[in-house]
Regions:
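Noncatalytic alpha-helical scaffold of FAD-dependent oxidoreductases
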Residues: 2-449
Length: 449
């Protein structure tokens, strides 16, 4: 499935503006904007593609309701606006590397898979990546997107500084070192505070990674050795369709050290794969990153999918729920009982670990977490009936949904599960007192009474 291409900025000049919004003035097909999965059509009638901060400031002065748009990888309306979307696609550069501070500064719309090779050539790496390298930095961090690893925080945890433009046109810089609480509130900001223009990320010396895959892990082995299995590599993912009392695949990603050895033919009863695999076993692994223990650069092994390929198996929907790691086995057992309900609409589920962080609106705030991800067939009518059942099963564990994916959790329940929500609302009102960045998603899920 190819991504929808955004319309090009009109060359017509509008009085008081450096460029005009893209609005429905030509054929409908050219003006329809959807997310990458194609399940959501954006409703904002105006669309801008500024190339500089000055152009962004010009847009901010004339736009009313507005919202930043990144790489369109969210499955809901979090990035939509009743009036204007402002794309960060032209803010896509690696700006600088500070070798003393061990940080890299990139523009907000930079995609991990695009700047990672450049960073690697300089001898540096990020601590982790998500399963897709196609996502933009600001959007990923604003929604607490993550990879896996019991000691690895989500992508937001690498952020040490950010620059954002507020509704008033003020350029605000916040850093982990100097701004403490404001910073912890702003990093996972859900697009509520302003438009991020650049971010500074922690880096480390570059490293290589190998992937070893195992198939058909017996369910009882997982229950008996859950923590051992998920700690068996730097980053570990479990794939399951909730059928046949087994985990279909175990992906173990390990940093390559001088003493790194083969994991052998067996992992707690799962057998080593004999060829490269797609998470959905029946699909071709052509678009997946290299496996079979072949070492490679961190940015070509930590994601599941190659940058040059469309990762999707076709049109799909996604949901994900985070539970405290201490309750992971109980949560798994609760979901496993729902296998017959989940399976008919499921493509695949993935189970990952994420280390705790301190961001106010992060699902992993103050808790090491296990995330249960669902890739669904694109049948929202049926999936929307299953989600409340999943959420009910996970309710005893105070499960928190991924902000950029699909969920049906009652907003009042979200309010209970995010202790810092009142403080976050104060922060949002401080930077956006007139609510220019509010939209249906925020009104429903965040600005709840």
């Amino acid at each position: 499935m190819k991504r929808n291409e955004f319309l090009k900025t009109s060359s017509m000049l509008v009085a008081g503006s450096m460029f005009s919004p893209l609005i429905s003035c030509t054929s409908q097909a050219k003006n329809v904007r959807k997310n990458w999965a194609g399940n959501y059509q954006y409703q904002a009638p105006e669309y801008y593609e500024p190339k500089t901060v000055d152009e962004l400031l010009t847009v901010m002065k004339r736009a009313g309701k507005r919202k930043a748009l990144g790489s369109c990888h969210c499955f809901n309306d979090i990035a939509d606006s009743p009036l204007a979307q402002i794309s960060t696609k032209n803010f896509n550069k690696l700006l600088s590397i500070d070798e003393q501070a061990m940080t890299v500064t990139v523009e907000a719309g930079a995609r991990y898979g695009q700047f990672a090779p450049e960073l690697d050539k300089k001898g540096y790496a990020l601590h982790n990546l998500a399963s897709l390298p196609h996502i933009s930095v600001a959007g990923a961090c604003a929604t607490a997107t993550h990879g896996s690893g019991v000691k690895n925080g989500n992508l937001s945890s690498a952020v040490s500084g950010l620059e954002l433009v507020t509704a008033k046109g003020d350029v605000v810089n916040l850093t982990r070192a100097n701004d403490a609480q404001l910073f912890n509130g702003a990093v996972v900001g859900l697009g509520a505070l302003g438009i991020i223009t650049k971010m500074t990320l922690d880096i480390q010396k570059t490293y290589q990674v190998r992937q070893d895959l195992f198939q058909d892990l017996p369910l009882q082995s997982l229950l008996d050795h859950f923590e051992e299995i998920l700690a068996s590599g730097y980053s570990v993912s479990l794939f399951t369709d909730w059928q046949d009392k087994k985990i279909s695949q175990v992906w173990v990603k390990r940093k390559v050290e001088a003493d790194t050895k083969s994991m052998g033919p067996d992992l707690f009863g799962a057998k080593a794969a004999t060829k490269n695999l797609h998470p959905i076993t029946k699909l071709s692994a052509e678009n997946c990153t290299e496996q079979m223990g072949v070492p490679g650069p961190w940015y070509e092994r930590l994601p599941h999918f190659k940058m040059g390929f469309t990762p999707s198996s076709g049109e799909e929907l996604q949901s994900e729920y985070f539970v405290p790691k201490m309750h992971a086995v109980e949560a798994f057992q609760a979901l496993e009982k729902m296998g017959s309900i989940i399976y008919p609409q499921l493509m695949i589920s993935e189970i990952r670990t994420i280390a705790a962080d301190s961001f106010w609106m992060s699902p992993c705030r103050n808790q090491d977490s296990v995330a249960f991800h669902f890739t669904w067939k694109q049948n929202w009518e049926e999936v929307s009936k299953i989600l409340p059942q999943i959420e009910a099963e996970l309710a005893p564990f105070n499960a928190r949904p991924h902000w950029g994916k699909l969920f049906k959790v009652d907003p009042k329940v979200l309010k209970e599960r995010y202790e810092m929500l009142p403080e976050f609302l104060q922060l949002a009102r401080m930077y956006d007192p007139q609510g220019h960045f509010r939209n249906k998603f925020l009104d429903l899920n965040i600005y709840v009474r």
